Amino acid sequence: MSKENINLPKTAFSMKANLQNKEPEILEYWKKIDLYKELRKSNKGKEKFILHDGPPYANGNIHMGTALNKILKDIIVKFHQMDGKDSVYVPGWDCHGLPIEWKIEEQYKKNKKNKNEVPITEFRKECREFAEKWIEVHKTQFKRLGVVGDWENHYATMSFEAEAQIVRELGKFLKEGSLYRGFKPVLWSTVEKTALADAEVEYQDHKSDTIYTAFPVKKTNIKELENTDVIIWTTTPWTIPANKALAYNEALDYLIIELGDEGDFKNKKIVVAEALLESVIKDCEIKSYKEIKKFKGKDFKDTICSHPFLELGYDYDIPMLEARFVTTEQGTGIVHCAPSHGPDDFNLCLKYGIKAIETVDGDGKYTKNLPLFEGTHIFKANPIVIEKLKEQKKLLSNGELVHSYPHSWRSKAPLVHRATPQWFISMESHGLRKKALKALDDTKFYPDKGRERIKAMIETRPDWCVSRQRVWGVPLPIFVHKTTKEILVDDNVNENIASIYEKEGSDCWFSDSPQRFLGDKYKAEDYEKISDIVEVWFDSGCTHAFVLEKREDLQWPASMYLEGSDQHRGWFHSSLLESCGTRGRAPYESILSHGFVVDGKGLKMSKSVGNVIAPEDILKKYGADILRIWVASSNYAEDLRIDYSILEQHADSYRKIRNTFRYLLGNLNDDFQKIDLESLDIKQLPELERYMLHRVYELNNNFKNYFKSYDFHNLYKELLNFCTVDLSSFYFDIRKDALYCDSKNSDRRKSSIVVLNIILESLVKWFAPILSFTTEEIFTLINKEQKSIHLEQFMKYPESFQDEELHKKWIELKKIRDICNISIEAKRASKEIGSSLEASLIINLNKSLFEISKNVDFSEICITSSALVHQSNTDEIIIKTIKAEGNKCPVCWKINKVKCERHSD
């Protein structure tokens, strides 16, 4: 063999990926072949895997969290498809709700248009058009990420079919009697003028006014309590006018103390919990006091107080009520209760027959029910209330506190609890809470900690408020009799409404006569037509009903729901309640939740901080496959960090993977030969090739186990290590000589070519769900018959590939090789030799290692010109590296004293 006849690698697969330009070409190819349609045909009739898409909101460009979510879904869908399942993916969008209303209102303000002068149906039409526009934008952005789905047949919560089914689902709750009208405190946004769900709330630090306020004892069974002030502490002074009761804990110890010279409270007696006395003394700067009496909380029974504003028109009794929620964590051990402004307060007062009244209107202003304060906005009321308390000599102390406080995640405005008439689904009346908790026990969670998180929420959540006081949403399909106040429950009316919505949408609820919906059986003048809309979480909670159950290509329940960890209180939660309430079980078999995307330091991304990275910017700089590597390599169970230094590391890993493929393709000259694994006589292969096939078999088992547990970051890590350690640093390094310098007909080279073909097919399939574009690029080079790598199935390997004894042997041989390489590198560092081929090895091994090293050519596996192996009497491996003597072969560069046998022609 002459130097000119060296088998140099040759491939059209370039070293430079150029993903930014290559990926759009592949997208066009997928569009041309209609990849999604081909996927459905290829696995038609097989077991289904249904990942039901949680609908993103149709508003604004996608962000890193959305990209993470969609890529993770796509990886899983593709894994199951290549595992032989019919893995259907139908993308969807959440379309109703406040954010879109706000956008349209902003446009109105810009154009000096008055929303109140615009017909509701026209406003809703503009909302619909806005959502439709962003759905199309999102489609393009998701496709660019490499996400494959039924884009032409997506679902949307604003579709007529969806709105009709939402009506039918509400009808089921109505029929069983668990949907009711109630007057309860709900989280309310005075900016958005509507109730909010827990999932629409975020907690931020907020500075609140604090007060220690006196409620004079009016009647008591404890003599020492006469002429005493009960002290409460609150961070919401504006709720004092709405106070109806005080709460204590019967198990706590309380103290009556007499103050010294303390201004308005000079020589007055006050009562606080013993455990909190020290903090009260400190906060209120009390200089002197004496203890009068200690007693148990249970002795408060039948005690009545007066309102601090008794002289200002608040001349009603304030009873003291026993409550377990009173603790000694903060305050005075006595809690002021305003039933219109807190769930605990409301429930306690309800228990004792004290009704909540409307004290604050939708704008956040006091109503006429509160003398003195009517018309004042509650967020401006604190100074006024504090001043009035001072005037009445009922203010012991006031201050400020920075604490975590609920805000609207949309407007960022602080929220309040406000009692309003709303529509609720009961958690208790038909056992919804129990059904939901049972369903969670039957659901798989990835990671498992998600189960306890959502369980804790279900265990403590109040009844589900499903009404909103807005216009862009599905109208509540409810009529209430004007005289009897009874809710109309009639399946025929409900189905009539649903049928109308199915044909023309729900706008007609706002424009058409009630008689059209009631039919001939009832008179419209007898009924109030409810004008509230359904909260958006009920909308999306019904997707299982109008997507999974209605489409022939899907099935109910879904195999998996996959969203961010915030959806334990959002979509996972609402879907669970809706499905358990109507079908008795969860609409999913498993839940996978992922963390949030944060910057490289672990901080929340914020435009004001300047640490936001947009998917679009990453695609322009790196391409989608680098972003997909970031998703696959990250532990989604935690928050996921990203910045350009992290992406650069992934780009470097990608280059290593790409070079691995390039080496395989180059040595095969892009002439891939599919190997029949079952008929392959593995015993005829050299030991090194047999070992590599064992590694392929072993890696495939690990791959399947990681895949089944959705442990992608360890799966990716193992694939990357196989490329860099097993292949590039080991097998490729050793076999480069045979592949380049052996004749094409040599058994050793032909055996290696067989293994390279198997490794190439294995790797391109293992990586396909992750590197969707790059593997497609490779597949077009090696397979002219099939249309796409994504239509392929994972390989199945014969058990003959598995050889544990050989594996154990090569573990030891690789250890010897590593020690030899250290010795060679030392000689190279001292300039005694150049390349390893200028070295000869003398290897001394103990008896057991010497035995397994028989018939092993260490010059081959250590890439030296020669190697001698001796048995020694010591357990230590002793390596001596000397400079090889002889002539250098111009082809293989090995140095021998005799002519190179391979290249002597």
From Swiss-Prot:
Residues that coordinate or bind ATP: 607
GO biological process: isoleucyl-tRNA aminoacylation
Enzyme nomenclature, EC number: 6.1.1.5
Single GO molecular function: aminoacyl-tRNA deacylase activity
Transmembrane region(s): none
Gene: ileS
Entries under Pfam families matching the protein: Anticodon_1, tRNA-synt_1
Keywords tagged on the record: Aminoacyl-tRNA synthetase, ATP-binding, Cytoplasm, Ligase, Nucleotide-binding, Protein biosynthesis
HAMAP family in alphabetical order: Ile_tRNA_synth_type1
Reaction catalysis annotation: tRNA(Ile) + L-isoleucine + ATP = L-isoleucyl-tRNA(Ile) + AMP + diphosphate
Record's comment describing the protein's domains: IleRS has two distinct active sites: one for aminoacylation and one for editing. The misactivated valine is translocated from the active site to the editing site, which sterically excludes the correctly activated isoleucine. The single editing site contains two valyl binding pockets, one specific for each substrate (Val-AMP or Val-tRNA(Ile)).
Residues at which L-isoleucyl-5'-AMP binds: 563
Main location: cytoplasm
Protein name, as recorded: Isoleucine--tRNA ligase
Organism domain of life: Bacteria
